[in-house]
């Protein structure tokens, strides 16, 4: 069989690889003399050497070969790099293709441009060392490892002509998130979705240790990958000429396999889960770099991971670096002006076929707004506040069902969750779409479909990664999850929020659909599952992020939940967190009042207030269960103190509590004072940890009078009301808090305290005997 590459093409591709490697080394080391036109001097070298060489030559090799495939077959392909510390490689490739100069005209394709390219890398106010948002063609920074394959599959969903080449580092492959991501092939429909080509880059070492997959033997590794449902092809070697031919032939064969799988599914229907191809590329870490430094082996070892030659106080190191860089023969690669030679330029694709200029890697360029039904049509009808009970998320489920239905043709909306869609009472969506499933099916299964648009897998990492990949390539989605277990992806949220923050500063990065979380089965109604399921702290985590990114909503009822969700699905470039219960709760606002309330973010509930502008106390609340307890406390206060003047303030958008100087949603001081006064006690019943309210309001005039009750890390398997009692968020405690802080009621404090303890004692005795809450709690309802 003839070699897939002619000798001429092999020589040119090898030269292109050398050029990319040369530019990569130059970025790590040089601040001047980019073409080595004069002997290398110490002042040409950066004072601080930062970056990672070890993975870069392998990444560059793959890029060159994928370019051949793209150009030969006119492919639509993007490149995701799991080991994103190989940032110099993708920067070099986008520079060689010209897309870098298109985005950053000052980095022209010339000697001066190359010098600026080198100097800016890992330089103050330059560019980061990883495949960051500043890098054309990137949707995955790869700083925190483990998410590349999930992002790749998310990008491929509903993109039938897209191939996502995903480089999985063998160190990255040891992470839990990546381990679960291999199973994504059970959720990829070849008739409707694109293809993912996983390439396991087996260079053998991490920072200072061998990698597990490099040390288990080829047979065991093959069995492992086949067990995940892939057909691995191995490309191994350290002789570039041999590896070039092997890799080219393997890619040709794999492309044919991908096309066969897709053609069969698209022409004859999906009859079985295909075994998708993948590549295992085993090449030396730090390939083409120095073999030894100070008589210690470097190439092919962990010493090649970062900066192989670091100490230039030793004169021989300067020569070693110069010899290394000259080994790429830059004079053969670039003309006298520093531009890549034309015969090499011709190897790369052009226009949007360049992976560094593919619009899927700048998803905002492709983003189309969702077709959204009128959420007013799903409203709970209320004759009066507190007259009707409803399950808020079940109401929302009907709206999401029709969001799904309205966008079936455009195929740009999916719902994600870890086996909780039905549990979270969103099952109305199954009237329109099943759950995507390409694995085996048994007769007891329900709502499974090869064409499903509900993505359920019991891995929060995978749900988050899929959704991020889906959003980053220009689509929309929502992630529904138990509140306590969303913490599993705390760090993934961090990375996405950082990505959005940086993208907002890059003019050519177009806004993408917001990352929308619906957190339900929340802390106050996890009484049946116990302490492990009780944690409202994700909103604290989110609130730490930039104000132009983070949004947190605590709708008190179903109509507010509808209004907030519609708003979030229309938004761009945010992380929206919505916390809402799924259990039957009293409903407070009709749909028009809900819209006004959510638009304002916070407001006085006139139906529950009688302060006439001069309250004795402000009873504030945020969250559905705290709202019930606050209103129940208001009723008790009026019973105990008939002439008391109470103002009820409900907060649905937590960020309004911050000053406007801190958050764009923040109320100005006058607006805040109109709600909370400047001198009256505020008893704040809060869904989460009390410290969050203090953090948000510490600059406000009346902060010293704000007394917050919320979750204080007390819980067990108990009754719903006992949960609030355990955390001092119950109506009896809130009532006592108010009386203790109203100066004119000082004479009632002793009696009020005794009454409180009597109520708590009755509660404890009753639940201990009956296993349920007191009738006065279970049967409570609001009356004006």
Swiss-Prot record:
InterPro entries: Phosphoketolase, THDP-binding, Transketo_C/PFOR_II, Xul5P/Fru6P_PKetolase, Xul5P/Fru6P_PKetolase_C, Xul5P/Fru6P_PKetolase_CS, Xul5P/Fru6P_PKetolase_N, Xul5P/Fru6P_PKetolase_ThDP_BS
Cofactor (UniProt): thiamine diphosphate
Keyword Glycoprotein tagged: no
EC number of this enzyme: 4.1.2.-
Keywords noted in UniProt: Lyase, Thiamine pyrophosphate
Top-level taxon of origin: Bacteria
Top EC category: lyase
GO terms, biological process: carbohydrate metabolic process
GO MF assignments: aldehyde-lyase activity
Paired cysteines (S-S): none
Annotated HAMAP family: Phosphoketolase (MF_01403)
NCBIfam families: PRK05261.1-2, PRK05261.1-4, PRK05261.1-6
Family: Belongs to the XFP family.
UniProt name for this protein: Probable phosphoketolase
Organism name: Rhodopseudomonas palustris (strain BisB18)
């Amino acid at each position: 069989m003839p070699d897939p590459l002619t000798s001429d093409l092999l020589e040119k591709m090898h030269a292109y690889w050398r050029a990319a490697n040369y530019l990569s080394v130059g970025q790590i080391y040089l601040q001047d003399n980019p073409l080595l036109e004069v002997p290398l001097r110490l002042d040409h070298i950066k004072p601080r050497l930062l970056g990672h060489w070890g993975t870069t030559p392998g990444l560059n090799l793959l890029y060159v070969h994928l370019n051949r495939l793209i150009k030969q077959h006119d492919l639509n392909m993007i490149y995701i790099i799991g080991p994103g510390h190989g940032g110099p490689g993708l920067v070099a490739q986008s520079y060689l293709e010209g897309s870098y100069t298109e985005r950053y005209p000052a980095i022209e394709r010339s000697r001066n441009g190359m010098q600026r390219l080198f100097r800016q890398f890992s330089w103050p106010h330059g560019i980061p060392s990883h495949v960051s948002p500043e890098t054309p063609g990137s949707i995955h920074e790869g700083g925190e490892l483990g998410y590349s394959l999930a992002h790749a599959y998310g990008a491929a969903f509903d993109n039938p002509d897209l191939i996502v080449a995903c480089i999985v580092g063998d160190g990255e492959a040891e992470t839990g998130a990546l381990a679960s991501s291999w199973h994504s092939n059970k959720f990829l429909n070849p008739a409707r979705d694109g293809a993912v080509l996983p390439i396991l880059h087996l260079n053998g070492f991490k920072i200072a240790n061998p990698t597990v997959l490099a040390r288990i033997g080829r047979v065991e590794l093959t069995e492992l990958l086949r067990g995940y449902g892939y057909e691995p092809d191995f490309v191994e070697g350290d002789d570039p000429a041999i590896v070039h031919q092997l890799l080219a032939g393997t890619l040709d064969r794999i492309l044919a396999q991908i096309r066969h799988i897709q053609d069969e599914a698209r022409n004859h229907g999906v009859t079985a889960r295909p075994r998708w191809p993948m590549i295992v590329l085993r090449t030396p870490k730090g390939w083409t770099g120095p073999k030894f430094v100070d008589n210690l082996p470097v190439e092919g070892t962990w010493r090649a991971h970062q900066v192989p030659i670091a100490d230039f106080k030793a004169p021989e190191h300067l020569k070693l670096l110069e010899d290394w860089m000259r080994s790429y023969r830059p004079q053969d690669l670039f003309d006298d002006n520093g531009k890549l030679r034309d015969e090499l330029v011709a190897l790369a694709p052009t226009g949007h076929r360049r992976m560094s200029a593919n619009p899927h890697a700048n998803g905002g360029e492709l983003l189309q707004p969702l077709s959204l039904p009128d959420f007013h049509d799903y409203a709970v009808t209320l004759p009066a506040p507190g007259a009707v009970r409803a399950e808020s998320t079940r109401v929302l489920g009907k709206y999401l069902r029709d969001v799904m239905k309205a966008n079936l043709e455009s195929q740009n909306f999916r719902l994600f969750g870890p086996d909780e869609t039905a549990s979270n009472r969103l099952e109305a969506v199954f009237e329109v779409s099943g759950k995507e499933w390409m694995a085996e099916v048994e007769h007891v299964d329900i709502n499974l479909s090869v064409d499903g648009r509900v993505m359920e897998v019991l891995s929060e990492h995978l749900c988050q990664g899929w959704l991020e990949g889906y959003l980053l390539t220009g689509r929309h989605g929502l992630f529904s999850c138990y509140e306590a277990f969303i913490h599993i992806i705390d760090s993934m949220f961090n990375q996405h929020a950082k990505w959005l923050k940086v993208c907002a500063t890059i003019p050519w990065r177009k806004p993408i659909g917001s990352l929308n979380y619906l957190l339900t089965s929340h802390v106050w109604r996890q009484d049946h599952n116990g302490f492990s399921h009780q944690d409202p702290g994700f909103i604290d985590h989110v609130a730490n992020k930039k104000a132009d990114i983070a949004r947190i909503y605590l709708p008190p009822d179903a109509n507010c939940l509808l209004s907030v969700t519609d708003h979030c699905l229309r938004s761009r470039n945010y992380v929206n967190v919505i916390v809402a219960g799924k259990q039957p709760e009293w409903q407070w606002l009709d749909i028009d009042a809900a819209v006004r309330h959510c638009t304002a973010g916070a407001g006085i509930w006139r139906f529950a207030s009688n302060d006439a502008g001069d309250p004795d106390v402000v009873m504030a609340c945020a969250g559905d269960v705290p709202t019930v307890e606050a209103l129940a406390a208001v009723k008790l206060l009026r019973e105990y103190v008939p002439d008391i003047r109470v103002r009820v303030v409900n907060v649905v958008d937590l960020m309004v509590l911050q000053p406007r100087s801190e958050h764009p949603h923040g109320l100005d001081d006058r607006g805040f004072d109109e709600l909370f006064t400047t001198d009256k006690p505020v008893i704040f019943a809060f869904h989460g940890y009390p410290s969050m309210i203090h953090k948000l309001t510490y600059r406000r005039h009346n902060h010293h009078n704000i007394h917050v009750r919320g979750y204080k890390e007390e819980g067990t398997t108990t009754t719903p009301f006992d949960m609030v009692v355990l955390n001092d968020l119950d109506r009896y405690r809130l009532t006592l808090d108010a009386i203790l802080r109203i100066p004119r009621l000082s004479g009632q404090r002793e009696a009020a305290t005794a009454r409180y303890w009597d109520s708590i004692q009755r509660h404890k005795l009753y639940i201990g005997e009956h296993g349920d809450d007191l009738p006065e709690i279970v049967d409570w309802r609001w009356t004006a």
